[in-house]
A protein has these predicted regions:
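A metal-dependent hydrolase metal-coordination microenvironment
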Residues: 2-155, 249, 255-316
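Flexible, glycine- and charge-enriched loops at secondary-structure boundaries
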Residues: 39, 198, 232
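Extended hydrophobic/aromatic segments used for targeting, binding, or gating
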Residues: 203-213, 217-279
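Hydrophobic, aromatic-enriched interface-forming segments
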Residues: 125-201
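Acidic/histidine-rich helix-loop elements
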Residues: 8-18, 192-193, 225-234
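Extended, intrinsically disordered, low-complexity segments
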Residues: 299-342
């Protein structure tokens, strides 16, 4: 059984890491042997991820992440895995084909939603410049320059916060915390530079699932789990009902970002879902400025329990098998060991 981190963001979306090489160096140094790239709206990092894994004796998993909208849940006021926006639902894809096979209409749909995501941040940048001027600052942020300097093509409000922090506070003692503060106060809902998403920013849940499947992947529901106060969203509070609904919607894979949750909740939820037939994987995201360990931990412990490690390993083996057209987790396990010469 090997250590797995099946959900890592890279500079192809937003990441704590400055490069794919840095992400994989951290994984290698920490003994994490199976690593999954999982950027928002992008598969462009797959080639570098694959090559970097081969160089370091790691096994690559290929993923992607979307924000979708389920209108039925929205009308019902049901909070799914976005605690502030009913109906808005994050969806990952696991085990996508590499080389990338997406083409035709699904590719056009992906490119359109990514373009709209970038356009929203461009509108945000304009509002941020207006606010800076009103506050007496001479600084003017150049959207295209930020996009070229700090991104691989996909730009988010975190990139604006980073550029602003570097321009105003280049020697900040805690740059990650300051960037989070700037983002929260200026760019999120209620802030002077906030721009709400337009409807075209969100594809229907079913469309996202179809794009993932067209790319060879497994549609995956990311569980939010318990928050710091032990609360769950409307959708996730009843675990059996959530599992049944996910099956009815065509999901057979789920994931958790382990630092959000306690070991007790992870063992309860992940164990139940695996027993229900779901592929279960865990990851860390690393989609904030804060540099955290790649080796997984939980909200209340410095590492996963043996039970959680085993669940994650079995899930990774199933994803690895799917990725190359094999039909069992056992075949995936053999593939991983052969690939990294264990």
């Amino acid at each position: 059984m090997l250590d797995v981190n099946a959900h890592l963001h890279t500079p192809y979306s937003f990441s704590a890491f400055s490069s794919i090489g840095e992400a994989l160096d951290h994984a290698s140094a920490e003994g994490v042997k199976v690593v999954g790239i999982n950027d928002f709206y992008s598969m462009e990092g797959y080639g570098a991820w694959n090559a970097g894994c081969m160089l370091r004796g790691l096994f690559p998993l290929f993923g992607i992440e979307f924000i979708s909208l389920n209108e039925e849940d929205q009308v019902a006021g049901l909070r799914v895995n976005d605690p502030n926006n009913p109906g808005r639902t994050y969806i990952s894809g696991k085990g996508l084909s590499f080389p990338v096979m997406l083409q035709g209409k699904p590719l056009q749909q992906l490119e359109a939603v990514r373009a709209e995501s970038n356009a929203q941040v461009e509108r945000m940048c304009a509002k941020l410049n207006d606010w800076l001027k009103s506050e007496g600052h001479d600084l003017v942020l150049n959207f295209e320059e930020i996009k070229a300097r700090y991104t691989k093509g996909s730009i988010r409000e975190r990139h604006l916060a980073k550029a602003l922090r570097i321009a105003l506070y280049p020697d900040a003692e805690n740059p990650a915390r300051l960037e989070n503060d700037l983002r929260s106060k200026l760019l999120k809902a209620g802030g002077p530079a906030f721009v709400p998403e337009r409807p075209e920013a969100f594809l229907p849940m079913k469309t996202v699932q179809e794009i993932i499947e067209a790319a060879g992947g497994i549609p995956t529901y990311p569980f939010l789990g318990d928050d710091a106060k032990g609360h769950f969203t409307d959708f996730e509070a009843d675990l059996q009902k959530a599992a049944d609904t996910l099956k009815n919607r065509g999901f057979r894979s789920v994931e958790f970002i382990t630092t959000r949750n306690t070991i007790a909740v992870l063992e309860q939820y992940a164990g139940y879902l695996e027993d229900e037939g779901f592929i279960v994987t865990f990851g860390s995201e690393h989609n904030t400025p804060a540099m955290e360990p790649v080796r997984l931990r939980t909200r209340d412990a410095s590492e996963l329990s043996d039970k959680l490690k085993a669940i994650n390993w079995r899930g990774a083996c199933a994803v690895a098998a799917h990725q190359v057209g094999l039909d069992s987790a056992d075949a995936g396990e053999e593939l991983i060991h052969q690939s990294i010469d264990l």
